[in-house]
């Protein structure tokens, strides 16, 4: 469905009711939404499950913030083929990014660009499938801890065009311990605050709960 209308300047807080064993509601679920729908300036705070999840479709999302999601911050499924541009991820409970490959006969490539991620207590940085298809660029990670990593670079039918990753590692950290399977090739270690890629936080600080409460001061 091509979609119509818009969702803008919305803060979604403390959602994610449990509707079954291991089945909670995402903060924002975009299922088969088309590129004719405008989704921009979205904040998801303290959701029980994923922050934003895409199931197919071609919708584009810009200026988004996911803060303290109980599960993954950003989750893509079923050959979503849109773009996520200019976003911040803060302290998810599981993966910062869970980027799945197409299912069945579906195909498509999505783009994730211009993001800043504070990993905090996350279980992992990026989790990909063998068949994930995406362009992944201009990302900055900080607040990274031992045990968090970027793994499973697509090796089967998948496609990964990744570039311009920067990370601030913990003291004594080794890049290849965090960015594995060749992902260190497109990642550069930088001092905190010295990043030259990532999100433009200024468009989020003035209206989001995270910004108004002072929790984006380091961004």
Language-model region placement:
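Extracellular beta-rich repeat passengers
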Residues: 1-219
């Amino acid at each position: 469905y091509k979609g119509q209308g818009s969702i803008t300047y919305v803060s979604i807080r403390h959602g994610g009711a449990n509707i079954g064993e291991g089945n909670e509601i995402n903060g924002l679920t975009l299922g088969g939404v088309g590129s004719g729908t405008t989704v921009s300036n979205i904040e998801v705070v303290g959701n029980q499950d994923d922050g934003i999840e895409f199931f197919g479709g071609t919708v584009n999302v810009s200026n988004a913030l996911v803060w303290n999601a109980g599960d993954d911050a950003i989750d893509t499924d079923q050959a979503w083929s849109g773009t996520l541009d200019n976003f911040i991820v803060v302290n998810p409970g599981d993966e910062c990014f869970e980027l799945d490959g197409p299912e069945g006969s579906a195909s498509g490539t999505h783009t994730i660009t211009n993001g800043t991620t504070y990993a905090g207590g996350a279980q992992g940085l990026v989790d990909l499938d063998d068949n994930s298809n995406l362009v992944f660029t201009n990302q900055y990670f900080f607040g990274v801890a031992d045990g968090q990593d970027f793994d499973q670079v697509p090796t089967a039918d998948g496609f990964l065009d990744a570039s311009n990753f920067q990370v601030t590692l913990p003291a004594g950290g080794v890049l290849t311990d965090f960015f594995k399977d060749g992902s260190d090739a497109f990642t550069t270690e930088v001092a905190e605050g010295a990043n030259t890629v990532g999100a433009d936080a200024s468009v989020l600080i003035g209206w989001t709960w995270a910004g108004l409460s002072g929790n984006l001061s380091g961004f």
